[in-house]
UniProtKB/Swiss-Prot annotation:
Cytoplasmic face residues: 1-463
Membrane topology of this protein: Single-pass membrane protein
SUPFAM superfamilies: ALDH-like
Single GO BP term: fatty acid metabolic process
CDD domains: ALDH_F3AB
Xref: InterPro entries: Ald_DH/histidinol_DH, Ald_DH_C, Ald_DH_CS_CYS, Ald_DH_CS_GLU, Ald_DH_N, Aldehyde_DH_dom, Aldehyde_DH_NAD(P)
Family under the similarity heading: Belongs to the aldehyde dehydrogenase family.
The species this protein was found in: Rattus norvegicus (Rat)
EC number: 1.2.1.3, 1.2.1.94
Name of the gene encoding the protein in the UniProt record: Aldh3a2
Full protein name: Aldehyde dehydrogenase family 3 member A2
Modified residues (Phosphoserine): S293
Length: 484
């Protein structure tokens, strides 16, 4: 593994990945891969998650194509140097911020959306000019296999490589020195990744999870709210890191919410949910048993049926849930939706704040002031008002967690920034030494006074202002020279 990382690092140091034209070519090649091998990719995703090809395309492939298109359209601007404001002491110099690639980065993908959560960070790494090792999740073995087959056919093999395997391979990867690590997965493994990265002072982006609350105000269109919640909760059989984990509502609304979600489940998946091509399955038996155990001792208002042979768990609603019960102590990551009663929005806010900061927060209300109040008085990775999941689809918004739900962010511009170093550059001339004497020993009260004048004044590039400042600096330089 060390030799493979070193091979990528040597290629990176050669400068091959830095030219803008090369980055665009690699992104175009990645887009060709997705388009030309779409059927193979969809078949792999479907095999891993019992997902229809239509759902695989809409849940994963379309997002990757959108991310690539964004980078192709915006990369010239993102990669350009940005001028920086200057003070009087540097007004005649060139000051700018130049994004530069970090080097060799490691991307560890997740199994629940094995295509998009593995390749979307890679789009940002390529755009920023890095070399990258991609480690797909071994739990989504079919998608991991197709990625290992396809990526070397389309991308530069000396800069981008796939490493497949389980815990042993991941552990060996984490022993290597990288310039950035982006990990998507659970908190326990996130801590392992961060500990390994700390040995090399490697920065990390951790996309973790948590219990994303969904508050439903009584002043709300329950038909719309429950339809959107049903879609976001049971999509991918609940195996979505930003799925609404539980509902907070007033007790008077609980029965209506249960009934409307039940009706919506039938609209979406039919009378026989198990036979619906749009309803997925739990990834493996271990996760199936964990999720099923969360039903023990709970009041099941709807659903609850399970089939171990096919790893099927029906869309399920729990009511009168004890906040201290097991189902409220861990991220569910499955099709179980607890409802917890609160007296009002104040109690809902306190309930949220008494727990770890979630990856997402959802608020449904006709009252925008109430929505913004909940936003202002809580903390979460992201927020969507009057819908769920959808902030993930807006690549002009950063996607990431806070606190226990993660650190750092990506998507669109934020992916480019995550995999870049914003390098400050100041280019000075060799003239103007009379002013520069202000910083040379010996020091004096006069020098300090003039330094404050030069260093604490900012200026913009208006022509008249620039002309006046040039004259001012020239006069000041003469005065300083005489005084020193």
């Amino acid at each position: 593994m060390e030799r493979q990382v070193q091979r990528l690092r040597q290629t990176f140091r050669s400068g091959r990945s830095r030219p803008l034209r090369f980055r665009l070519q690699q992104l175009e090649a990645l887009r060709r891969m997705v388009q030309e091998r779409e059927k193979d990719i969809l078949a792999a995703i479907a095999a891993d998650l019992s997902k229809s090809e239509l759902n695989a395309y809409s849940h994963e492939v379309i997002t990757i194509l959108g991310e690539i298109d964004f980078m192709l359209g915006n990369l010239p601007e993102l990669a350009s140097a940005r001028p920086a404001k200057k003070n009087l002491l540097t007004m005649m110099d060139e000051a700018y911020v130049q994004p530069e690639p970090l080097g060799v980065v490691l991307i560890i993908g997740a199994w629940n959306y094995p295509f998009v959560l593995t390749l979307q960070p890679l789009v940002g790494a390529i755009a920023a000019g890095n070399a990258a090792i991609v480690k797909p999740s071994e739990l989504s073995e079919n998608t991991a296999k197709i990625l290992a087959e396809l990526l070397p056919q389309y991308l530069d093999q000396d800069l981008y490589m796939i490493v497949n395997g389980g815990v042993e391979e991941t552990t060996e990867l984490l022993r290597q020195r990288f310039d950035h690590i982006l990990y998507t997965g659970n908190t326990a493994v996130g801590k392992i990744v961060m500990e390994a990265a700390a040995k090399h002072l490697t920065p990390v982006t951790l996309e973790l999870g948590g219990k994303s609350p969904c508050y439903i105000d009584r002043d709300c269109d329950l038909d719309v709210a429950c339809r959107r919640i049903t879609w976001g909760k049971y999509m991918n059989c609940g195996q979505t890191c930003i799925a609404p984990d539980y509902i907070l509502c007033e007790a008077s609304s609980q029965d209506q919410i249960v009934q409307k979600i039940k009706d919506t489940v039938k609209d979406f998946y039919g009378e026989n949910v198990k036979a619906s091509p749009d309803y997925e399955r739990i990834i493996n038996l271990r996760h199936f048993k964990r999720i099923k155990s969360l039903l023990e001792g709970q009041k099941i208002a709807f659903g609850g049926e399970t089939d171990e042979a096919t790893r099927y768990i029906a869309p399920t609603i729990l009511t009168d849930v004890d906040p201290n019960s097991k189902v409220m102590q861990e991220e569910i990551f499955g099709p179980i939706l607890p409802i917890v009663s609160v007296k009002n929005v104040e109690e809902a806010i306190n309930f949220i704040n008494d727990r770890e900061k979630p990856l997402a927060l959802y608020i449904f209300s006709h009252n925008n002031k109430l929505i913004k109040r909940v936003i202002d008085e809580t903390s979460s990775g992201g927020v969507t008002g009057n819908d769920v999941i959808m902030h993930f689809t807006v690549n002009s918004l950063p996607f990431g967690g806070v606190g226990a739900s993660g650190m750092g962010a990506y998507h669109g511009k934020y992916s480019f920034d995550t995999f870049s170093h914003q390098r400050p550059c100041l280019l000075k001339g060799l003239k103007g030494e009379s002013v520069n004497k202000l910083r040379y020993p010996p020091n004096s009260e006069s020098k300090v006074s003039w330094s404050k004048f030069f260093l604490l004044k900012q200026f913009n590039k208006g022509r008249l202002q620039l002309l006046l400042l040039v004259c001012l600096v020239a006069v000041a330089a003469v005065i300083v020279k005489d005084q020193l």
